[in-house]
Structure formats: C-alpha cells, structure tokens
Amino acid sequence: MVNTHVNLPGLDLKNPVMPASGTFGFGDVPAAQKFDLNDLGAMVIKTTTPHATTGNPQPQIAILEDGVLNSVGLTNPGVDQVISEKLTKLRHQYLDLPIMASVGGDSEDDYVEVAKKLSASGLVNALEINVSCPNVAQGGMSFGVHAGVVEELTKKIKMAVALPIYVKLTPNVTDIVEIAKAAESGGADGISMINTVLGMRIDVKTRKPLLGHNMGGLSGEAVKPIAIRMISQVRQVTQLPIIGMGGISTAQDVIEFILAGANAVAVGSAHFEDELAAKHIAENLPAELEKLGIEDINDLVGQVKFN
C-alpha cells in the first residue's frame, strides 16, 4: 500500500493534492459541488480582503494554446461575509477537511486585519499569504517583489495569529531565493509557489490586448518549467514545507514537483480542461508511485539527481 499522507504545519493531508486558491471559489462553484472535496488533501479558498472587491474589467480570462491568462482580480465579498457565510457553510459541509484561507490586501494593516479575523473564526487550519497584491502605499508594486517587505509583512502576521502561515511567492522577481529566505526569516511556517507569471497577448485584428486589464497572470503548462526550476532553487536553501503549483495536470506532474522539492501541490488551470482535475490527479497518484516502486511519497521530496 502506497503512503500518500503528508503532514504539514496545520494541514494533515490524506494526499498532497489541493486546488489552487481561486479555483473552487469558497467551495461554492459548480465544479466543487460535483464531487466530495474530502477526496483531496485540503481545500484552499479564494483570496479574501478586508472589504468587498469586484475584480477587473472583462474579459478577465483568455485560454491560450499552452496555458491560461487571467486578470480576474480578487473578487470576494470581504472577510466578514466570507467568515459568516462562505466559510461557515464550507466548514459545516466538511467538518474534517483541512481548509487553508488565502489572505490579501492593499496594505500591511489590511493583511493583518484579514489574517486575525480568519484565525479567530476557528474555521480554517492555515493561512496562505498572497503577497502578489499591489502595495498601494508603495506606488502599487507587488508586496512580494521586495525581500524586506515580505519579511516585515510575514513578521507582523505571524505575531497577530496563532495559525501556521504559508507565504505565496510571486515568480515576477529577479531572485526568488532571496524572497523565500525573507519569508523564512519573518517566521513563515511554509511557502506556496509559484503564483502566476505576468504576461500579455494581443489580438492582431483589433490590436487590443486579449484581457480587459491588458496584462494578467499566466498559468498552466507554459509555466511548469519555471515553477519546477524555482521550487528546486528554493529547496536548496530551506527546509520549510513547500506547496508547489504551476502547470500541474497529471499525477506524474505531482511526482516531478515533489522531486524538485515540493511537499504538496495545488492544481489550478488544469480545471479548464477537466473540472475534476484535482480529484483525478489524487486518484491516479498511488498507481503512478507504485509504477516507480515508491512506498512513501514523502521519501521523494527534493530527491532530484542533478547532472
């Protein structure tokens, strides 16, 4: 019997597969209603902000040959309503499923406020800190591009909450290793990586970008080599748990990410092709491990053999 159980801070996972934040909303999107979320290791909810956010102009999503470009924005009803309605309902439906909430904001105070409220709710097991949000006080640059800002933000949230926190790294930086080290110095319990890669596509007939917001985040197959490279680099400098993401669509991809250094994975864009992608990947994983003669998935973490 192959062991796929993974134990991370705050997250006791029956298998290492979860949906990426935003994929299944707050567990209320049609795809999430079509199967038992207990088939997954955990549920990750959409990024939550202090107040309701409407998102970016349409079109928000462009499906490409080898990925997805999106500028949905952080559409959510605000943290109070997320707790009183969305999370309460989700937790009532799934009493034992590990739930990770994603935290966003325009300022450090926003992050701390949302994190404190989510932590105090008693409805979630861990927090993912989405540092790809624009830092309004610093001219709109993403929080996640400055090591000093990431360290300080992580420290402030860590001091304010009892829950484990996972800092979600943006790949749109010169040196992701420096940012990962900063998150660890700030007290992060784990790292999620990678968020989407900033991109743009243009319709040659209209000469307009495909997205209403012009630029957006690229995810899916196209970013997989970037994600694997960055996870491998970060694994060389930290023992923190890593939740890997970026183009995972098969059980074999999961194994590749774990060899690079991830402990668990999140699946996002694959759901555009198969709305039950995460479920199918989790189901297929034991057989793939068996083929490779692996008895315990945890034995594979970071075991890439460099040339």
Curated annotation (Swiss-Prot):
- Which residues does the annotation say bind substrate? 46, 70-74, 130, 195-196
Top EC class of this enzyme: oxidoreductase
Q: Which InterPro entries match?
A: Aldolase_TIM, DHO_dehydrogenase, DHOD_1B, Dihydroorotate_DH_1, Dihydroorotate_DH_1_2, Dihydroorotate_DH_cat, Dihydroorotate_DH_CS, Dihydroorotate_DH_I
Location of this chain's protein in the cell: Cytoplasm
Active site: residue positions: 133 (nucleophile)
Q: Give the cofactor binding note.
A: Binds 1 FMN per subunit.
**Known pathway:** Pyrimidine metabolism; UMP biosynthesis via de novo pathway
Report the catalytic activity.
Answer: (S)-dihydroorotate + fumarate = orotate + succinate
- GO biological process: what's one of them? 'de novo' pyrimidine nucleobase biosynthetic process
UniProt GO MF annotations: dihydroorotate dehydrogenase (fumarate) activity
Q: Which domain of life is it from?
A: Bacteria
HAMAP family attached to this UniProt entry: DHO_dh_type1
Family from the record: Belongs to the dihydroorotate dehydrogenase family. Type 1 subfamily.
Q: Share what the entry says about its subunit structure, partners included.
A: Homodimer.
Role description: Catalyzes the conversion of dihydroorotate to orotate with fumarate as the electron acceptor.
What's the protein name?
Dihydroorotate dehydrogenase A (fumarate)
Species of provenance: Lactobacillus delbrueckii subsp. bulgaricus (strain ATCC 11842 / DSM 20081 / BCRC 10696 / JCM 1002 / NBRC 13953 / NCIMB 11778 / NCTC 12712 / WDCM 00102 / Lb 14)
Which taxonomic lineage does the organism of this UniProt entry have? Bacteria, Bacillati, Bacillota, Bacilli, Lactobacillales
